[in-house]
A protein has these predicted regions:
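Phosphate-group recognition and catalysis centered on beta-loop-alpha active-site segments
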Residues: 1-248
Length: 248
């Protein structure tokens, strides 16, 4: 069986509020070498780590990230009360700069930075790239930008040394006739083709969301070894002895 490479999906999101510094640190402490985060822009153009299209699930607030200034967002708590009750009541939204500072201290970590479609649709590709790309100057070996928006990735690919990764929910959304090729392709496990077509592509294939050991073993048996998971600690522990996945 192949040795798996696990990517911490929004940090250790199974046990901590996703995309927060405590979730990212918990993933690193668990042994993660690869982490993935989501980026959106505040009303006053400050990049923050946040996944959802609205603030309700994670912060119990109305509206979307770009409805608020960064100072306003910092007054909200990222609690995910449905999952964690009030355990993390004082947990704050992290800025992208805080995450970059964290990566510079933990230079062994590799990060996938997802540029969210909502942000790109609202502010435009040009503005997003003008703000975000310079923040990662000198970190080209540590960072890969990913997105469902292939146009913005093509611009990154053509203007910088950063790796890129296309994200799709269905295999049919992956278009190979674009005149360029990303280094990575992220595909949902439900969207994988039934045949071995997924193994024939040039980009490295990463699959999400791999939430249990049985699924991880199934994908490994098919030759897919880059697995994105909310349960980074459990997965790393399960495959820590020769990649056998013997723990539950």
């Amino acid at each position: 069986m192949l040795k798996p490479t696990f990517i911490a999906h929004r940090g250790y999101a199974a046990s901590f509020p996703e995309n927060t510094l405590i979730a990212l640190e918990a993933a690193r402490e668990a042994g993660a070498e690869y982490i993935e985060v989501d980026v959106q822009l505040s009303k006053d153009l400050v990049p923050v780590l946040f996944h959802d299209r609205d603030l309700q699930r994670l912060c119990q607030q109305q509206g979307v990230i770009h409805d608020y200034t960064f100072d306003e967002l910092k007054t909200f708590n990222v609690t995910d009360v449905e999952k964690f009750s009030d355990i993390y009541i004082a947990n704050k939204i992290a800025s992208l700069q805080e995450f970059i500072d964290y990566l510079k201290v933990n230079s062994g970590l590799k990060a996938f930075i997802e540029l969210k479609r909502l942000m790109i649709d609202h502010f435009g590709e040009k503005k997003v790239l003008e703000i975000v790309l310079p923040m990662f100057s000198g970190m080209e070996q540590q960072i890969c930008f990913i997105s469902y928006n292939q146009s913005v990735l093509k611009k990154i690919h053509g203007s910088s040394q950063f790796a890129t990764g296309i994200v799709v929910d269905k295999w049919s959304e992956y278009n190979t006739n674009t005149g360029w090729e990303s280094e990575w392709l992220f595909c949902s496990v439900e969207g994988l083709p039934e045949n071995n077509k997924a193994l024939a592509i040039k980009p490295k294939l990463a699959v999400f969301e791999v939430g249990n050991i049985g699924l991880a073993k199934h994908l490994l048996a098919k030759g897919i070894c880059h697995l994105e998971t909310f349960r980074i600690k459990e997965m790393l522990q399960a495959f820590s002895k020769g990649g056998t996945g013997t723990k539950t």
